[in-house]
Amino acid sequence: MTPPSSSSHFPSPSSANNDFHSLSLEAHGSLSDKFISQFRLNYTIIPIAQKSNISLPFLTLSPCSFTICSLRARLHSLHGPSTVFLKRETSQISARVNDENGFTASPSFFSVDCFDELFPTLSTTDEQPKEPSIISISSSSSDPSSSPPPSSSLLKTPDNDFCARPETFVKSDTADIKLQIHQNNLVLTFLDTTTVSKVNIVLEIHIPVLRDFVTFEQYIPLMFLPSPFETILSFDNLKSDSPSSDLHLGWDHTVSKESMSQSIAEVLNPYNKGVSRSLNDATNMETYHWSPFPPQFSTFNDNALRLRIYYKPKSWLPKNSSCSLSVDVKATLLETTPPSCEVSYNLLLTCRSSNRFRLFPASTPNSNGLCRNDSKCRFLMILPETIIKSPSSFIGDSYNIANIDPPSSMNVQSSEFRVGEVQSFTTNTSSFAFTFKEIVQLGSKASVPMILFPAPSNYKLTIEKPPFPCDLTIPHTAINDSWLPMKLKETNAISYYRKTCSSCKYPFQFFINKLPFYQSPSLPLSATYVWIASALLSVQPGNGSFNIMLSLKFVSSMKPGTELLTIKQPKSSLLNWGLVNGYPKTEGRIVLLPRNDIVLIQADQPTSVFDLCWTIKPTYEKSSNFSCLQLPIPVLNTPILTPVTINIQSTTYYLIGYANQNSKKTLDQPTSLLVLGCKAKNVSELILSYLPEKPIPDGAPIVTNVVETNKTNEAPSSFRKCLQQFLVFLTFTGMTLFILYQLTFPYGVAKDNSSFIDTPLPHSCEMEKSLNVLQHKVLQLQAVNMKLHDYYEKEPTEIYKTVSVTSTQIMPAVTKMSSFELEREQFHKAFGFLRLNRKKDDNAN
């Protein structure tokens, strides 16, 4: 297949921009010895006459980092050809006007508005910028390997050029063309095209050679290529007999969608297959010539295409490694404010023989492919910038660390990381240790140095002396897939080890989260302990039934086979399915008792995740005026606060319940709820939260039945409708969640300051002493109501706060435990079976 030609498949280049007759670009590149590629960009621009203020972006400045070494602009006008030459390494500006007549004068035809960004060494200001600007600036005069390619006649600078000062070019009102930076592009603006017939621009730029750690290939980014030009691309490479070192066009697939990658591959394949080569025997350089890219080819840039030239250098990695590497990461929690931990990374490298290493591109292998005696053995790793800058990080005396790529390289798609190459001197069998340390706050990410080569034989992550409880989160990696918990030999540590020892493709990060708790146990912990790290309760209403899913994450030091917890079956439900650590093999881990209760058994690993699903079918009971759904929120007999996430997947259901008064210190505020009195320090643990039908503005009187000098504020109609439709009332007596459905009780004035709302219990159940706990919780709302009234009078803006996220996390208060079995019998006797069919209920009434 031959590459598509612009004449057969695409319009002429002039149609890409109606303001120009022709836009063409010749881009020729070559490699140097220090991970730098050199490009010469030759632009030919022919504008359309009788137009003014035409802007043309011709060089994209970001996100690719490069250095502009020189710029030459040649203007063809009615007054004759004129040339401007700007060169970085000599800090010199040269100009010639009307070359044919030998006349030299100030270049008033050319104006530059971006000297500070392009050539800071030529800037008229005394103060230099502290940080590099959009374009990466680095001096090339001291580096002989970064010298520009052989100059053409266009690049040659006459000896008698007029040496102009920078201010001569800046903001000239009489200029015909102007050079600017606009929206991260180098832009050429034609102020008047009546006298300009043609413009030639030659740019010399240096671009770093980067490395893709997904394909382990080196590449030269081509994001700087402009979009409206017909581009002819060529590149010089050292002649090689190995097909693996051939150049080919590719793209940054890490930021491309899978569906789009296929279409891009179909476009690039003809260009790679139809590439032509020419060999220069004198220099042993082979030049690759790709077919011209039409202007429409750059349309892929808008779809996140990152065009690159890839090549595979020979012996990029050692073929046979005789080194072993072990990595031990420890996180020690510190008693600081805010809470933080010290993360230390200990790397132990043992080299048995350095002569078995093949070399990296910076060195030259001998005839037998082994290292020379003066070569150094190396391994590569990705280092976070915070570690490099940390004063507590150090490396052994027999090692030095160097950057194989520029510090601002995009190899890992993040400026937070740097690719490091660690070199060791030639030694016999020996071991060396690397230690890096950093302080991170709890809940923030800690970045572990990623070892690209050699693959670690042992990778362990340990949290020492955690508070009770403490959780570990590893993003972008399934912990059951790549990392597994380690059997605890100590009672005051949580350990994980990496399942495989292959090279990691992405920088490894983890989060250490301190879960909220009421009481910190003394350390070290007891020999046997169990805690629920997290619990997720999801209610999914369906057609005539409910699906209730409960997910529990346990951390336990119990022996495998030990009973962890008994979970009561939800009322009128059947167990649908169960999973242990994501697998349906639950034999010996989930036991269903004859009374349909569930017993969870300790698995082989200290961290276990149990997923349970029940299906509840609707039943009916005419004697009661509301129905109750009892759901399981298990809790252990410990003074530990278990975080429970409640997720009700419906837009017609509303929540009313508890929120922890100290929730700002422990977790985010309950979301999708209007939180009342969240800042009141002297309010009890019971805080009312509900979701109104419509957003209520700040200061609206929404507190119901407030006693104020014999005056009562009634609840808004939206709040009444909310209660009549659906309520979720959370009471953590026995850690049980009650859903109250279709409440039909009246709204009356508070009687004797003893009730917040009229008791919703049927008269036949009022004498049931076993329900006093639930009724007492309802009556406690009146006390909260009074506290809220005080705050409403003083600080109304502190009482009402609206948040708008779709999930909620409720932290239960620790109360006296009651018997699950007793509650089950009492509620069955009081309310009968579950009734959820509203339509039938309305007809019955």
Swiss-Prot record:
Residues 122-158 are annotated as: Disordered. Residues 132-145 have a biased composition (Low complexity). The chain crosses the membrane at residues 726-746. Keywords: Meiosis, Membrane, Transmembrane, Transmembrane helix. Has a role in meiosis. This is Meiotically up-regulated gene 4 protein. Coiled coil: none annotated. The keyword Transmembrane helix applies. It comes from Schizosaccharomyces pombe (strain 972 / ATCC 24843) (Fission yeast). It is found in: Membrane. It is a single-pass membrane protein. Its main location: membrane. It comes from the Eukaryota. One of its GO terms (cellular component) is membrane. One of its GO terms (biological process) is meiotic cell cycle.
